[in-house]
């Protein structure tokens, strides 16, 4: 599933062709995503001008000059394509601008979504209402995380995946950040001391920034809007590397935690 770096990369790619553009056409080729595409999406978007593109957690937000906010989630396999040569079966949504830029939302597994709300309702939108701070902002800091971990006996990896605690982190980057911080994913959260929490916060920010710089991580379906792959997957230290050697020489292990594959080096991570 695309996580924060993939959505951030997507928003940056879309911004290059959509920012300030007037929308002249919208086509819903197949409305059956995780939730049906809003039936009034054409009348609300056609003729409007895009004034901002941003990200919140794993969602992208495109706002027009009518204060309509188009919110997308890429699900398991979704991605945006810029000026595709032709449309495929799973190009669900197509938007065209006055300067002849065409973008399409492609999602073969249909776990993605498109929603449309008023800009002033974004903070109270059901999926944003209780979401945690962005990990790349100052609001996500060791003091904040310490308060969240203080009384929890849940495994630290499970806490990092809780979007109410911190926004946008998924399985890939939780595994990589915990490895960099040398913390075992199963450690009870309340057992981490402040130095370890500080190291973990640094590692989360560092891993996410590196991933964004590499355009995210391509495993199966993800690609940037311009068609380029995300190359951070070539820099993984543990994710997807069961049976391979860690940099320390120990064998990387995999086990299931909370229904998700978890990769670690039990020699490095304590």
From Swiss-Prot:
How many and how are cofactors bound here? Binds 1 zinc ion per subunit.
UniProt EC number: 3.2.2.23, 4.2.99.18
- Keyword hit for Lipid metabolism: no
Tell me which UniProt keywords the record has, alphabetically: DNA damage, DNA repair, DNA-binding, Glycosidase, Hydrolase, Lyase, Metal-binding, Multifunctional enzyme, Zinc, Zinc-finger
What the entry lists under Gene3D superfamilies is as follows: 1.10.8.50, MutM-like, N-terminal
Span of zinc fingers (FPG-type): 237-270
- InterPro entries, alphabetically? DNA_glyclase/AP_lyase_DNA-bd (IPR015886), DNA_glyclase_Znf_dom_DNA_BS (IPR015887), Formamido-pyr_DNA_Glyclase (IPR020629), FPG_cat (IPR012319), MutM-like_N-ter (IPR035937), Ribosomal_uS13-like_H2TH (IPR010979), Znf_DNA_glyclase/AP_lyase (IPR000214), Znf_FPG/IleRS (IPR010663)
Catalysed reaction equations from the record:
Hydrolysis of DNA containing ring-opened 7-methylguanine residues, releasing 2,6-diamino-4-hydroxy-5-(N-methyl)formamidopyrimidine; 2'-deoxyribonucleotide-(2'-deoxyribose 5'-phosphate)-2'-deoxyribonucleotide-DNA = a 3'-end 2'-deoxyribonucleotide-(2,3-dehydro-2,3-deoxyribose 5'-phosphate)-DNA + a 5'-end 5'-phospho-2'-deoxyribonucleoside-DNA + H(+)
Q: Pfam families annotated for this entry?
A: Fapy_DNA_glyco (PF01149), H2TH (PF06831), zf-FPG_IleRS (PF06827)
| Entry's Gene Ontology molecular function annotations | 8-oxo-7,8-dihydroguanine DNA N-glycosylase activity; class I DNA-(apurinic or apyrimidinic site) endonuclease activity; damaged DNA binding; zinc ion binding
Q: Which amino acid positions bind DNA, per UniProt? A: 90, 109
Q: What's the superkingdom here?
A: Bacteria
Query: What cofactor does this protein call for?
Result: Zn(2+)
**What processes in GO biological process is this protein linked to?**
base-excision repair
Active site (UniProt)? 2-3, 58, 260
Which purpose does this protein serve, as stated in its record? Involved in base excision repair of DNA damaged by oxidation or by mutagenic agents. Acts as a DNA glycosylase that recognizes and removes damaged bases. Has a preference for oxidized purines, such as 7,8-dihydro-8-oxoguanine (8-oxoG). Has AP (apurinic/apyrimidinic) lyase activity and introduces nicks in the DNA strand. Cleaves the DNA backbone by beta-delta elimination to generate a single-strand break at the site of the removed base with both 3'- and 5'-phosphates.
Q: What interactions and quaternary structure are annotated?
A: Monomer.
**What does the similarity note say?**
Belongs to the FPG family.
Q: Output this protein's name.
A: Formamidopyrimidine-DNA glycosylase
Q: Which organism is it from?
A: Zymomonas mobilis subsp. mobilis (strain ATCC 31821 / ZM4 / CP4)
Give the lineage. Answer: Bacteria, Pseudomonadati, Pseudomonadota, Alphaproteobacteria, Sphingomonadales
């Amino acid at each position: 599933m695309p996580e924060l770096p993939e959505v951030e990369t997507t928003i940056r790619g879309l911004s290059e062709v959509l920012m300030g553009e007037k929308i002249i056409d919208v086509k819903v080729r197949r409305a059956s995503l995780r939730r049906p595409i809003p039936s009034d999406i054409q009348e609300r978007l056609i003729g409007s001008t895009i004034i901002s593109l941003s990200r919140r957690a794993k969602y992208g937000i495109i706002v027009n000059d009518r204060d309509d906010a188009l919110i997308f989630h890429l699900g398991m396999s979704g991605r945006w394509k810029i000026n595709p040569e032709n449309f495929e079966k799973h190009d669900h949504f197509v938007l065209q601008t006055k300067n002849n830029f065409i973008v399409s939302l492609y999602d073969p597994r249909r776990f993605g979504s498109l929603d449309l709300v008023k800009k002033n309702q974004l903070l109270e939108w059901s999926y944003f209402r209780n979401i945690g701070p962005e990990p790349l902002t100052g609001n996500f800091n060791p003091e904040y995380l310490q308060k969240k971990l203080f009384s929890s006996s849940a495994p630290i990896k499970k806490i990092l995946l809780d979007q109410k605690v911190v926004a946008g982190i998924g399985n890939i980057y939780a595994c990589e950040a915990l490895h960099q911080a040398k913390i075992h994913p199963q450690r009870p959260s309340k057992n981490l001391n402040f130095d370890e929490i500080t190291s973990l916060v640094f590692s989360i920010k560092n891993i996410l920034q590196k991933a964004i710089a590499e355009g995210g991580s391509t495993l199966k379906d993800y690609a940037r809007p311009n068609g380029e792959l995300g190359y951070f997957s070539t820099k993984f230290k543990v994710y997807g590397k069961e049976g391979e050697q860690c940099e320390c020489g120990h064998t990387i292990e995999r086990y299931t935690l909370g229904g998700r594959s978890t990769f670690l080096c039990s020699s490095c991570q304590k």
